[in-house]
Amino acid sequence: MRGGLERGGLALAQTAVATFAQPQQGDTSLVVNTTEDFDYDYILDCQPTAHKSGLALALSNRKVQLRSLDTLGLVHEFHAHNSTINEVWTSPSSPYQLATCSSDECVKLWDTRAALPAMVVPVGREVWSLSIGCGETLLATGTNELAMFYDVRTGNKLGEYGESHIDAITKVRFHPTQPAFVVTASEDGVVCFFDCRIPDEDDALESILNVESAVTTIGFFGPQKENIFCLTGTETLDLWNLWTAERLHHYATIRDDCNNNSLPTDYLINCVYDDNSNELFLLAGNHDGDMNAVNIGTDTASAGKLQHAATLKGGHKAAIRCIYYDPETTTLYTGGEDTRLCKWAVPGTASASAEASDGYSSASSSNSRRTTGLDPAGIRKARKASRPY
């Protein structure tokens, strides 16, 4: 992200409307009065497919979309689950392989070239998070209190860890460079680091981190991805070393700190780690759809320090749910509760000048709608809550 900021900063390049409002009682007219409170399909999650071939979106209408990273054009769409899709995972090796988990108590593995799922794993509990590791052979799922493991090749359950958490497991993530190690994070405020090659839970537990508040988002950072950041439901940020279980810093008032420095912040979205500059950036948002990128101090000298890096506004009209940053093209993608997918790029680059390929995706058409007052589906106002969900 530092590279993009130094080359002129990130600006809105394109906007795609993922879904349009369904007509009610035969009314097919566009909604003109955008002050009304309409129900919109949220973009809940976004993940890049292998070889940067596209972007997979999980929508609140229980569908998955595949879109072009260059144009945001719609490539493929299918109905995935019978309840909320909580996460989507994409294979790092095959652009056609992805997995989804849902509150309908199952995980589905997909080959997007086929109409039906390649495999359905009946977990039997609401699945809040999933990750696949160990050479894409082991599926880890986060459910109520249990981390459950399955063989991706057969769908058979291999085991579970159920003693380390006392509340719902909100995130499971295999380590990016040590694929036999998995992190679990929970609403109980605890983050655990396991060697999942070991079936006994006590023996498998490498470290345990007490974040002290319900964990909503985690991610790895550092040259060897030896550290982890944790965002919580009370809008705090924790930085830890996974291997030593050392707390690097606890940002207890980071939302207030942003507001006190004229950075309007209602919630914390996610963090982006820049491998090239070894910097961690926090993306914080407000209910109007604006974002600020804040550089987070991670070493001893800079711990506790915050530095405003960029303001991103004009793309969204409601809370932002998910982000993906492509370091190769210095491009940021954001999805929100306004059913919009936005692309932010350095002005003048190839990524910023890519043309839209269908009627769903166009920066110019989006600007035209704002000018005329017409907005397809009348964007729903963000809920006035401390979290966007």
Q: Which stretches of residues belong to each language-model region?
A:
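Beta-strand-rich domains and repeat architectures in extracellular enzymes and scaffolds
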Residues: 37-62
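Structured C-terminal portions of repeat-based eukaryotic scaffold domains
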Residues: 198-329, 334, 343-356
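A positional/structural detector of protein chain ends, strongest at the extreme C-terminus
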Residues: 1-4, 385-389
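Beta-propeller domains
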Residues: 57-76, 301, 342-344
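Repetitive beta-architecture junctions, highlighting loop-to-beta-strand starts
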Residues: 15, 62, 73, 96, ...
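A short helix->beta-strand "capping" segment at the edge of beta-propeller domains
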Residues: 4-42, 71, 304-312
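WD40/WD-repeat beta-propeller blade N-cap
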Residues: 35-43, 78-85, 121-127, 162-169, ...
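WD40 beta-propeller repeat blades
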Residues: 87-268
